[in-house]
Amino acid sequence: MLTLDCIYRASFALKNVIRRTDLIYAPQINNESQIYLKPENLQYTGSFKLRGACYKISCLTEEEKSRGVIACSAGNHAQGVALGATKHGIKSLICLPEGAPISKVEATKRYGADVCLVPGVYDDAYQKALQLKEEKGYTFIHPFDDEYVIAGQGTIGLELLNQLPDVEVVIVPIGGGGLISGVAYALKSLKPDVKVYGVQAQGAPSMLQSIEHERRECLSSVSTIADGIAVKEPGEHTFDLCSKYVDGIVTVTEDEICAAILALMEQQKLIAEGAGAVAVAAAMFNKVPVTGKKTICVVSGGNIDVTILSRVIGRGLDMSGRSYTVTLDLHDKPGELMGVATIVARLGGNIISVLHERNNNSNVTACFLRLVMETRNAEHISLIRNALLEAGYTIVN
């Protein structure tokens, strides 16, 4: 049974193992609130998962260690287990979904683990890990539904209260629920009036649906850029703890996640993965009541694959009004392209791509013009659109 003493013991055990990440004041995230970030993306291995994994491994018996450990993960728990096992001289095997970011797969190998890639998502990797555990006798290290793991993650809650004693709101990502379970339990045990909110991706709301239906729900599928929280079913322990100690759960869209990643990069010079940015997205887009409150957003991880980072940035620019694509139906005559470009330039838009297409079967005297431009914000986009319409141009999209 999880107790506050368990979390204090975990904190002591992890004293020389993990980095106690400092809070970062980030007022630009939401100018109506006092926002602080808990940057666990700066943790060793790039996420909070190191805490729970290392504490669990430190509590294993010698017999359990001798059998080697096996774990399943979307990527971050894998790295925590791999590093923790290697430090203790223990053999480790990690089951990862085939779609896990290459950066997470390679990092897991570098930390000393063997890797088994499994078709599907996290839950499929979980079933494969259980199968191999039975066949080979490994000791299983659950990524979230284990009281030692939860206690390890709960050390973040202790740190938050030490760093900002008068905190009023804490926002935490939710996948399987290990992080928020430990953090919420620690916070509510020591400061019952603090509000704790969980955030899930809109495409993977397993804990939200479970809480709403008052029983654990297993989703048929999950789809989100936030691979670290793409979990079909929450754990038994985590569901019970969230039911008791979490004040509310919200979801954020893919575009909101991308906008949050971009904001963290530009404003705070922090790299967050999708799962790591959902708490910030919830604060940015007022998904939880933070107005006038001292609020901490847990940035849970930063292990984003650089091959998809450019796409994330592109969507973030679109979401924040920093990039705009417009398609116009023009008369095919000299000067039309120049006329459009002149309006955009006069209003401060910066055209970075032009596609001029004459192949319009419906009207031989017409053509399409598609422009991609850099803009300042949504109001700037509206100004450019209105100017084009007032000049007599037809906007298709």
Feature names for model-found ranges:
Residues M1-N397:
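PLP-dependent amino-acid enzyme catalytic core
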